[in-house]
Every structure is written in C-alpha cells, then in structure tokens.
Amino acid sequence: MKKLLLIVSLVLFSIPIFAQNIYSKAYGNSKNPAIIFIHGGPSGNSNLFEGTTAEILASKGFYVIVYDRRGEGRSKDENAVMTFDESFNDLNQIYKTYNISKANILAHSFGGIAATLYTAKFPKKVSSLVLAGALFSQQETYDHILKNAPEYFKNDTSKLSQIKKIENLNKSTAEYRKGCYDIASEMNYFAMPKPTKESTALRNQYEKSIFYKTAVKNAESPIKFYKNESKNNIDTKSILREIKAEKIPIYAIYGKNDGIFSEKQLKDMQQITGKNNFKILNNCSHYLFVDQQNDFINFVSNKLKNKG
C-alpha cells in the first residue's frame, strides 16, 4: 500500500513544462528539498538521467527537476545562442516556474562548468552543489586524453596522425573538443569496464523507453557555444574554492574508471571538497547514475540530508 501511494504521489507531482521552448519536468513532492539536474553537453540532454534515476532519487524525499538547456535535447530553439548567460536566464525561470527560492544543484559532465558558474553568480539560490563526473579543468582533461592516446594507438599510424592534427588545433574550438572526446570514446574512456546485471538492466530498460527515443543531440549546439561564449575552455577550481568559502557545501562523486580525468585532477577535486564530501565509485565510468546507481543515489541522498 505504501508503495502504491508513493507511485501515485510521483505521478501527481510530475509536472511537464514547455514554456519558452524549454523542456522540464518535476518528480516528487514539491514540499521536499529541491534538486535541479544540470546535464552535460553542449549538445547533450537530461534523458538518460530522467529515464533511469530522477524518479528513484525523488522517492528518497526530494523534489527532482530535470530540464534540457535551450537549443539542446528537447528544448528546441533555432535562435538559441548557447551562452552561459542564456542558460542562467532559463535556469532562473525554472526556479520561478516551480516556485523555488533555493535548490541543490546536481551537475553532470559539462553541466559541472555551467553549474559552478551559476552558483558563483547566484549563490543565494543554491543550497549545495553536487558534482557528478563533472568537468572542472577542461584543458587538463584534453591534455590527459591526448597524452594517453599515442600509447593506446601505437600500432595505428592513421590514428596517430589524427591525434597530431587534434593537438595542433585551436584549443578554444568545437573541433578541438570533439576531436579529444572522439579519441576518448575510441579508448573506451566513457565505458563501464564490467557491466553488472543491474546496470545492464537499467540500460536495456532505458533503450526501450520514450526517453531513449527522444534523446536528441543537436550537432549545432557546440558550434554556437564556441562561437558565442568566451568561457569555452576554463578551469573552475578557484571558483569552486570561492563558493566553498561562501559556506555553500560542495560534494563530488566520480567513477574510478572515468578515463577523461587524471589522478591529479581527482586529487585536486578532493582537496577542494574535503575527503568526507568526495567519493570514488569502483567499476564505474562517466555515467555514474547508471553504472552504479545505488551507490550514486545513496551518496547524493545522504549528503543532502546531512549537509556538512
């Protein structure tokens, strides 16, 4: 009976909003602490998180809001300029739409950059910042990928030539970013090393869902972002330290097998958050909320319920 009531409450409080070309949806009871999920990109979407994790996280006592940034995913807008300021304006509108004055920000991948900059600009709107496989020192990530690539492809002369070409590109371009991540993908840097029954079932379930069918990636988004946004290859460690100094809790969780982060980068992040607010998940890569969903949800839930 309790399970039935929980399902009913989740349905009752799932509110789709399509105003101003922005797709968003809320899960859980609006009286519970709010969590806003910021997806990766540019050209990403919140489909995988929404289709696998949002509802379960909400059942732990949170009001979970997902949305796709303007010009990305289900938030189609040909006139989107893809700047951080544009995304901040839309995020502020999300707060208004759901009548939220303050929220916990849960940021994944590139969403970590956007969420960090937003928190620094609007600190009174953020209860805490949770970085999940989140970018924070972009050039260090690119350097790490390109440093390891020659050894991986040592017997592939065409690939070695491709790596050299990427290294010589302008480091503030969409082409450079794409080149680095394409190489990382070929090295299986985003892949879970040993899929479990649970993670496999989650992915199979997702691939049969409407979320998978509507998981649109806008190839124009990165091009617009690099054209219109000057902060397109930045290091946010100093900003994170300033946020922490403002007494806004910062939590970070990363996959041990997420190949786009070096050991040094993860040590730097732990130094910022503090050991108690930092966690590494074993047998886990970039998509933590699928690879090790239970551990991911437990970390987020426990930290947000016991801030400190």
Model region roles, listed by residue range:
Residues 101-145:
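Conserved hydrolase catalytic core segment
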Residues 131-172:
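Flexible "cap/lid" loop of the alpha/beta hydrolase fold
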Residues 163-241, 247-248:
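Alpha/beta-hydrolase
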Residues 246, 252-254:
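Short beta-strand/loop motif that positions the catalytic acidic residue
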Residues 284-293:
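Catalytic histidine-centered segment of alpha/beta-hydrolase-like enzymes
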